[in-house]
Amino acid sequence: MKFPASVIASVFLFVAETAAALYLSSTYRSAGDRMWQVLTLLFSLMPCALVQFTLLFVHRDLSRDRPLALLMHLLQLGPLYRCCEVFCIYCQSDQNEEPYVSITKKRQMPKDGLSEEVEKEVGQAEGKLITHRSAFSRASVIQAFLGSAPQLTLQLYITVLEQNITTGRCFIMTLSLLSIVYGALRCNILAIKIKYDEYEVKVKPLAYVCIFLWRSFEIATRVIVLVLFTSVLKIWVVAVILVNFFSFFLYPWIVFWCSGSPFPENIEKALSRVGTTIVLCFLTLLYAGINMFCWSAVQLKIDNPELISKSQNWYRLLIYYMTRFIENSVLLLLWYFFKTDIYMYVCAPLLILQLLIGYCTGILFMLVFYQFFHPCKKLFSSSVSESFRALLRCACWSSLRRKSSEPVGRIDTDLKACTEQDVMPTTSKVIPEATDIWTAVDLCSA
C-alpha cells in the first residue's frame, strides 16, 4: 500500500502557514499596523474555513453521526484529525485481512504499440486512503490559490513599501510560495489523471521535479510583476485584476450559454438546482483564481457531463502563455516609467530582464516536461518538438502564400490544425477507478 506522503505535505503546509500567519498578525498588531493585521488574518482564516468544509463535504460527515469529527473541524483542527485517521488506517492495513475487495481495470502504457488491460484488487483500507488523498489534494488547491497566493502578494507588497524584510515575513512568504507551487502541481496531476483515466498513470520523480521548477519560476515571476505594478499604480492594478478575474470566471459560462446545452443536473445527487449553481460558481471562482497566477492545466467545460475537457488543447496553451508574457512585459514597462524613489537603488532594466528571463525559464521547463517526462507522452499524437516544427512550417507557408496574394482562408485552418492537437487516445472505454479520479466537483467540493 502506498505511503500517504501527499497527506503529510498538505497538513504540514496548512499548519505551518496558518501558524506563521497568526504570529505575523500579532507582530503587526504590536506595531500598530491594523490594516496589515486584518488582511493577513483574512487570507489565512478564509482558506482555513474552506479547507475544513471541503474535508467535511468529501467524507459526507454532515449526514453521518460523527460528533468528534465535526467538533475538530469547528475548532479548525480537521486536517490534523484526518491525518491521524490516515495513519491509523495505514498502520492497521497490514494487520487485518480484507473481507471485501473491489476490482478495477486499467490499461498499461503501450509497449511496442500494444497496451494490456490489467485488473487490480482494491481493499476497503486502500479505498479509504485514496479518498483521504483526494480530499487533501483538493484542500491543497483551495488553500493555495484562495489563500496562499493573495497572502504571498500581500506580504511581498508590504516588504516593498517598508523596504525591510523581517524573519516572520520571509518565513510566511516561503511557505506561501511552496503552497502555491504544490497546489499547481496537484492541478497538473489532476489533469493527467482525468485525461487518461483509462490508463494506469505513474509519475516519475524527475517529472515532479520538472513540474516544481516550471511552476516555481512561473508563479514567482508573476507575483513579483503584480507587486511591482501595484507599488506604483495602485488604482490601475484593480482594473488589471478585475479584467483577469472576470475573463476566466465568465469564459466557461459564455461557452456553456453559447452551446445551448441543458443545465447540468448530475453533479451531486444530494444537491438541489441552487446548490448545483453554487458549486459551479465556486468552481469557476477557483478556476479564475488559478489562471490569474498560472496555467490551470484543467479546462472547464460546463456543457460536458464531467465538467472538464479531456482534450489537450495546445492552441489554448500557446495563446495563454503568449498573452501572459505580453501582459507581464507591459506591466513591467509601466512600472519602469512610473517607478518612485523607493527604487532609487534598483537597476530597473536588469530587474525587468531577469523577470522576463525567469518567466521564459518556467516555460522552458514546461516544454521539457511535455517532451521528455510526461507519464503519458506515448499517447500523444505529436510531441512538443513536432508541434513546434509544424507551427513553423505553417507560419512560413502562410507568409509565402500571402506574398503571392492567394486566399488565406485554408491557411488559417491549417495553422489552427497544426497548433491545436487532440492527444486523447482512441481506445475502448474501460472501468476507471472511481475513487482515484478527481472530477470537477471533487476539485471544488467546498
Swiss-Prot record:
Q: Which Pfam families match?
A: XK-related
PTM-bearing positions, type Phosphoserine: S115
Membrane topology reported for the UniProt record: Multi-pass membrane protein
- Give any single GO term for biological process: intracellular magnesium ion homeostasis
Taxonomically, which superkingdom? Eukaryota
The UniProt entry, under PANTHER family, shows:
ENDOPLASMIC RETICULUM MEMBRANE ADAPTER PROTEIN XK (PTHR14297:SF8), MEMBRANE TRANSPORT PROTEIN XK FAMILY MEMBER (PTHR14297)
Name this protein carries in UniProt: Endoplasmic reticulum membrane adapter protein XK
What gene is this protein translated from? Answer: Xk
